[in-house]
Swiss-Prot record:
One of its GO terms (cellular component) is cytosol. Gene3D superfamilies: 5' to 3' exonuclease, C-terminal subdomain, 6.20.10.30, BRCT domain, DNA ligase/mRNA capping enzyme, Helix hairpin bin, Nucleic acid-binding proteins. InterPro entries: BRCT_dom (IPR001357), BRCT_dom_sf (IPR036420), DisA/LigA_HHH (IPR041663), DNA_ligase (IPR001679), DNA_ligase_AS (IPR018239), DNA_ligase_CS (IPR033136), DNAligase_adenylation (IPR013839), DNAligase_N (IPR013840). It holds the Pfam family Nlig-Ia. This is DNA ligase. PANTHER family: CHROMOSOME TRANSMISSION FIDELITY FACTOR 18, DNA LIGASE. Its EC number is 6.5.1.2. The keyword Transmembrane helix does not apply.
Length: 794
């Protein structure tokens, strides 16, 4: 076979593969490979066609914009084709683009020459949104048509759907717009909108989307515009098509005019001069990429002067005056070599993908999270599969999907080990149950756990690492490596063992000398008097983060109350749902955990908890009989029915004793609700449980109120404070804890709603902002005086 024949075969193969991917991407909205893989195939085809120009044909994917309109929508012919942009993947690609532009404008630039010398070119710069390109046609200021790009020449008529996008003006604002104006831009979905859409889909059992781009495309191409209207779509203009009238003579000027007419444009639009300034913009947007509210995959540079754009013109499928500088791919293809199982702090046995190493977003990736076995099942994953992996920012790489057409015949199923890979204990499957706000319990999949607890070194190490962390017991100098040594040498088998370590035991650890040994023992001793909130957080209760730990400590006041609180009682705490309440209750009900806590509180060697006291007034005053009845989750008894029952009978005992005739006298209480209530309390276990909950509420100081009361029991309740600069008497974390203990919310930024800013040495922009807004400012002495006034220990 000759080289030409081999090239012809490869070209035919590439064209078929690219056409297939184009169809899946543009028509079905179901991309089967990452953009980076498509770009590689496309560049390979371009290179072969350049080397063998006799094999170039008009129907090659390199000679047209991808996609064909779906038959379900009417067709729209674009008077001016909607072409795609050329791509730059390396800095040299950008420099080559700038050189070609300057060469093409040699006769128009001051001091220009045929080699691209002379003045620098002005470029407009904006992020490249990852959405769907559309055209909006305005006639006499009225929106008359919306269309997709389609194949660049013919798109789909999506007018009724475009009209539902809230930031698309149906009538242009102001004046001076052309009689006919075609606005081109991107329809996209913000990250927050995408997450909310998927969360809603999960709740209703609907289909979730893989990414915001797919969600935007799928939403925009709905035949029922009511569905589109329910989706959080947005539009951002980046250019224009046909125009009957006049527009400004620069790209930036046109976009600024759009903004004046009510058409949204990018807030990141900038005008720069020269290739280096373009590179600086690219770097700046790249650094801020993860903080942006929407997904982008690069930036777009366009020659700013429209006259220069016309002079440069077009080539086969793209303008010569614009280029998209792509970011390193966040999605790549690789092979799943195997799956290993790791054991976490709570004993959860989770699968981790071992991958054939691949570069993703500039980093070599060989491992990726699989979350849990439900995710493995959802993906339909097998060892040997070709998979799409994604890495964004600091997020752990994830397996996004399986490329089924590349699955090998010998692909192997993934099975959970029967025994813990670390300690050999049994692995048990636990069904997760979500207790919804309604009356039903909903299965949420399963989790696999090692039953070895602290006898499992993996669980023990992670438990100790969490226990000593800065926001928990804050034992300085006890890093991960030291914890591993302590566990591996058998010196620590429980968090309580930290407080019995001797000088000799620590001194013998690798890397320790006299000073470091004394420092560590001092740090351990200094942690013996933690606040109740820190101690609760340090215990590592599943689903209990730092804020929930503070809430528990502030509301219930003592470890004893928290430990014996029934889950139904815990749900009276704000932001504590049923799932978290059951996790807390089950943790303290577990005998093993109770033993560990008892060891930690040993009078001779353990910790002495601070800030233990009474139940908070806000918690004690928040209960109502109607709310209590509603929380019992009796079928057909909703909040309204519960209020009627509370009003009619006045006490739980009265409701329990009510017979059928009594219940029928409750105004507008449905018969099925009355029957359900009677059936519920005919079960002795339900009566016993309800009375136990009421008894504990009363023990904790609650009394039924006809309405919920908000008690302003803390001196700084409702106030927002900000800490900035360096504090000398205490760390900012300690100051934050003390302010929160007084009821304040401690924020990270200053606004007009900020009550006070505490500024230590080195305070910068936050102090300046406070002065600008007229916000009260305290120095450290003022803060300490405040603490003294309210009896807060320094």
């Amino acid at each position: 076979m000759t080289d030409t024949q081999a090239a012809a075969e490869r070209i035919a193969q590439l064209r078929t593969e690219l056409d297939t991917h184009n169809y899946r991407y543009y028509v079905l909205d179901e991309p089967s490979i990452p953009d980076a893989e498509y770009d590689r195939l496309f560049r390979e085809l371009q290179a072969l066609e350049a080397e063998y120009p006799q094999l170039l044909t008009p129907d090659s994917p390199t000679q047209r914009v991808s996609g064909t309109p779906a038959s379900a929508f009417g067709e729209v012919r674009h008077e001016i084709p909607m072409l795609s942009l050329g791509n730059a993947f390396e800095e040299q690609d950008l420099l080559d683009f700038d050189r070609r532009v300057r060469e093409g404008l040699a006769d128009l630039l001051p001091g220009g020459d045929l080699l691209g010398g002379g003045a620098e070119v002005e470029y407009s710069c904006e992020p490249k949104l990852d959405g769907l390109a559309v055209s909006l046609l305005y006639e006499r200021g009225q929106l008359v048509r919306g269309a997709t790009r389609g194949d660049g020449s013919t798109g789909e008529d999506i007018t009724s759907n475009v009209r539902t996008i809230r930031n698309v003006p149906l009538k242009l604002h102001g004046e001076g717009w052309p009689e006919i104006l075609e606005v081109r831009g991107e329809v996209f979905m913000s990250k927050a909108g995408f997450e909310a859409l998927n969360a809603k889909a999960v709740e209703t059992g609907g289909k979730t989307f893989a990414n915001p781009r797919n969600a935007a495309a799928g939403s925009l191409r709905q035949l029922d515009s009511k569905i589109t209207a329910s989706r959080p779509l947005e539009f951002c203009a980046y250019g224009f098509g046909q125009v009957s009238g006049t527009l400004p003579d620069t790209q930036v000027g046109i976009l600024e005019a759009f903004r004046g007419w009510g058409i949204p444009i990018s807030r990141e639009l900038r005008l720069v001069k020269g290739a280096q300034a373009c590179r600086d913009y690219y770097d700046d947007i790249g650094r801020r990429r993860d903080a942006l509210a929407y997904e982008i995959d690069g930036v777009v540079f366009k020659v700013n002067r429209i006259a220069f754009q016309r002079e440069l013109g077009f080539r086969a499928r793209e303008p010569r005056w614009a280029i998209a500088h792509k970011f390193p791919a966040r999605e790549e293809l690789t092979e799943l070599l195997g799956v290993e199982f790791q054991v976490g702090r709570t004993g959860a046995v989770t699968p981790v993908a071992r991958l054939k190493p691949v570069q993703v977003a500039g980093v070599t990736v060989s491992n990726a999270t699989l979350h849990n076995m439900d995710e493995v099942a959802r993906l339909g994953l097998r060892i040997g599969d070709t998979v799409v992996i994604r890495r964004a920012g600091d997020v752990i790489p994830q397996v996004m999907q399986v490329v089924l057409e590349r699955r090998p015949a010998d692909a192997q199923a993934i099975e959970v080990p029967e025994h813990c890979p670390v300690c050999g204990s049994a692995v048990e499957r636990t069904q997760l149950v979500k207790r919804s706000k309604g009356k039903e319990s909903i299965s949420e999949g399963a989790i696999y756990r090692c039953v070895g607890r602290l006898s499992c070194q993996a669980q023990l190490k992670q438990a100790i690492i969490h226990f000593v962390s800065r926001r928990a017991m804050d034992i300085d100098g006890l890093g991960d490596k030291i914890v591993e040594q302590l566990v591996d040498r058998g010196l620590v088998a429980s968090p309580a063992d930290l407080y019995t370590l001797t000088y000799e035991q620590v001194f013998e650890l690798e890397g320790f000398a006299e000073l470091s040994t004394n420092n560590l023992l001092t740090a351990i001793a200094d942690s013996r008097k933690p606040s109740l909130a820190r101690f609760i957080f340090a215990l590592g209760i599943p689903d209990v983060g730092e804020e929930t730990a503070k809430l528990l400590a502030r509301s219930l006041g003592s470890l004893e109350r928290i430990g014996k609180a029934l889950p139904e009682v815990l749900t009276y705490l704000p932001d504590v749902g049923a799932e978290v309440a059951y996790e807390i209750h089950n943790f303290f009900a577990d005998e093993h955990n109770r033993q560990v806590i008892a060891q930690l509180r040993d009078a001779e060697h353990g910790v002495q908890l601070q800030e233990e006291g009474e139940v908070a007034a806000e918690f004690a005053a928040c209960a109502s009989l109607a709310g209590f009845i509603d929380k019992l989750n009796i079928p057909f008894i909703a909040a309204t029915g519960a209020e009627k029952l509370a009003s009619r009978f006045g006490s739980l005992d009265g409701i329990i004793r009510a017979d059928w005739l009594d219940l029928r006298q409750v105004e507008r209480l449905p018969e099925r609700a009355a029957k359900s209530l009677r059936d519920f309390f005919d079960e002795p276990a339900n009566v016993q449980r309800a009375l136990a909950i009421e008894a504990q509420l009363r023990e904790f100081g609650m009394h039924w109120q006809s309405e919920r009361k908000a008690v302003e029991g803390l001196p700084l309740a409702g106030q927002t404070w900000v800490l900035t600069g360096t504090l000398e008497a205490m760390s900012r974390d300690v100051a934050k804890d003390k302010l929160e203990g007084l009821g304040a919310k401690v924020a990270g930024s200053v606004s007009a709603k900020t009550h006070c800013v505490v500024a230590g040495p080195g305070a910068g922009s936050k102090l300046a902002k406070a002065n600008e807004l007229g916000v009260k400012v305290l120095d450290e002495d003022g803060l300490l005086k405040l603490f003294d006034e309210h009896g807060v220990a320094r």
